[in-house]
Amino acid sequence: KNTDDGAKIYTPLTLKLYDWWVLGVSNRLAWGCPTKEHLLPHFLEHLGNNHLDIGVGTGFYLTHVPESSLISLMDLNEASLNAASTRAGESKIKHKISHDVFEPYPAALHGQFDSISMFYLLHCLPGNISTKSCVIRNAAQDLTDDGTLYGATILGDGVVHNSFGQKMMRIYNQKGIFSNTKDSEEGLTHILSEHFENVKTKVQGTV
């Protein structure tokens, strides 16, 4: 598996279905973490003025940010970058960056962002949770001294999935869309603590 396996699912067609299936049906019924009740408020609470969104999906969350926000987008998938940029409004978008998050970011981005979000990125990345530590490290380098990295990921270990969630986990992991069967809150906290002094996690449903 490589990083591209998780990104391939996001074609122009699937992006049109993403909000309904992922943010609507799956978050509520499979993962027990309804988008508008939990994930959207979480996204907006920690949003800084100069923000980098990594793993942009359809840009749903970005449609709710203040007009004054400066937003940069990072994704391996050009279709996602273009869809999110168009949906959020080109006037808000400062940079569109096609980049593999396992690789160090361009030096010009270091120390630039007040906040960085990773919503539903980590569970799509190949490997176990410990191999994803470098993804956290690379993002941390792009934050200002008092910047915040935040996000959400679907856990596979240490949580109880319902039958719908179990089926989705099995299918997505078999297809390489997810790589999260052993991802746990404890493991996530560990890799965050390797790069940040102040770490806070909360589990809602299996997210």
Where would I find each of the regions flagged by the language model?
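Class I SAM-dependent methyltransferase SAM/SAH-binding core
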Residues: 50-105
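Local beta-strand N-terminus motif with an aromatic residue
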Residues: 48, 93, 112-114
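Conserved class I S-adenosyl-L-methionine
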Residues: 1-47, 60
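C-terminal alpha-helical "lid/dimerization" subdomain adjacent to the S-adenosyl-L-methionine
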Residues: 150-201
